[in-house]
Amino acid sequence: MWWRFPNLRNNSKYIKNKEEQLLDNQKDNHEFISQSRKRINFD
């Protein structure tokens, strides 16, 4: 199905960006979870 990606050369860059985005999301989620835990502990 490679014809669905006419810019195949840019795909690796795109995939890398996606992975970095995922990592950033995980970081954000982790921070959010730790903040929520703090909030819960304060209650």
From Swiss-Prot:
This is Putative uncharacterized protein DDB_G0274163. It comes from Dictyostelium discoideum.
